[in-house]
Curated annotation (Swiss-Prot):
It catalyses: 2-formamido-N(1)-(5-O-phospho-beta-D-ribosyl)acetamidine + ATP = 5-amino-1-(5-phospho-beta-D-ribosyl)imidazole + ADP + phosphate + H(+). It is found in: Cytoplasm. It holds the Pfam family AIRS_C. Transmembrane segments: none annotated. Its main location: cytoplasm. Belongs to the AIR synthase family. Its EC number is 6.3.3.1. GO terms for cellular component: cytosol. This is Phosphoribosylformylglycinamidine cyclo-ligase. Keywords: ATP-binding, Cytoplasm, Ligase, Nucleotide-binding, Purine biosynthesis.
Length: 343
């Protein structure tokens, strides 16, 4: 009988070490003096700088990127999907006013491809730089029998900090407040299962096909990274009181905005922005009902802020100074803790 090794059973420890070597330089770009120990150890060490805080509150979030992975897999392009992963986590941290501190990742694969994982982590590092947080560690798990060769999944975990008295939870939102929408970069990381079904099956589109309306291939459009809103919003928080914020993810504006509304108020949205072409294409190709579009996709608005009317112009001016398009898209009125969309 031949000797049996871990590698023969489907787990290549040497490939895992190769991944660490490949990603080290990218990860180190994200580190700051607060990181006492990053990748390579059993755990990461982060020294919380409480200067400027009276009662610092740690905020945590975890997320993934759903079936956007299938687009990356089909195209063999993995260098931007890590940006999406960071965006999904740090944008959620941001909704309560938290500054992201550090990020960790989990990558699970059927068969480890060091180059593929290195590309994934490269994107994560890029996202962390954009969010001004440190990529302090992660886990790469090779699991033959759980995943088929070529299949993989990723998850991200983030921690941020906010002053307790400055937590933004929507509790002060009242009738008369104004809703500001900040543009998305496209489909972001939600609704890809519906998009794939509508475009690739119903519409018979191909990911490599050039689409005139986009000026790029369909696959490139779908892989456009999720926008990270951290820097402009943290800057805005120093100038304007923000009463509530929502990251528009799965469920769209319809399901996400009510999460920050107090009882007895509702959000009335007027669609005065140009809905991105990708959503129009999905709707047409799949004959997707309009109500389903609004409950699945961001429809061009990736992040929402609620401010009092007197602060609207300053808020929009600040956001646009970072080259983030922003509009007044609605108002808060007395009502039933819901969203009403007027097209």
């Amino acid at each position: 009988m031949e000797e049996l090794t871990y590698k023969a059973a489907g787990v290549d420890i040497d490939a895992g070490m190769d991944v660490v070597r490949r990603i080290k330089s990218e990860v180190e770009k994200t580190l700051n003096p607060n990181v006492l120990a990053g990748i390579g150890g059993f755990s990461a060490l982060y020294c919380l700088d409480v200067t400027g805080y009276n009662e610092p509150v740690l905020v945590s979030s975890t997320d993934g990127v759903g079936t956007k992975l299938k687009i990356a897999q089909a195209l063999g392009k993995y260098d931007t999907i890590g940006i999406d992963l960071v965006a999904m986590v740090v944008n959620d941290l941001l909704t309560v006013g938290a500054k992201p501190l550090f990020f960790l990742d989990y990558v699970a694969v059927g068969k480890l491809n060091p180059e593929q994982v290195a590309d994934l982590v490269k994107g994560m590092a890029e996202g962390c730089l954009e969010a001004d947080c440190a990529l302090v560690g992660g886990e790469t798990a090779e699991m033959p029998g759980v995943y088929h060769p070529g299949d993989f999944d990723i998850a991200g975990f983030g921690v941020g900090v906010v002053e307790k008295s400055k937590i933004i939870d929507g509790s002060s939102v009242k009738a008369g407040d104004v809703i500001i929408g900040v543009a998305s970069s496209g489909i972001h990381s939600n609704g890809l299962s519906l998009a794939r079904k509508a475009l690739l099956e119903y519409g018979n589109y191909h990911l490599t096909a050039y689409v005139e309306e986009f000026g790029k291939t369909l696959g490139e459009e779908l892989l456009t990274p999720t926008r990270i809103y951290v820097k402009p919003v943290l800057d805005l928080m120093q100038k304007v009181e923000i009463k509530g914020m929502a990251h528009i993810t799965g469920g769209g504006i319809v399901d996400n905005l009510p999460r920050i509304l107090p009882e007895k108020v509702e959000a009335r949205i007027t669609v005065n922005w140009e809905i991105p072409k990708i959503f129009k294409l999905i709707e047409k190709a799949g004959n997707v009902p309009r109500r389903e579009m609004w409950r699945t996709f961001n429809m061009g608005i990736g992040f929402i802020l609620i401010v009092e009317e007197a602060k609207v112009q300053e808020a929009i001016k600040t956001l646009e100074s970072f080259n983030y398009k922003a509009w007044v898209i609605g108002e808060i009125t007395a009502g039933e803790r819901r969203v009403i969309i007027n097209e």
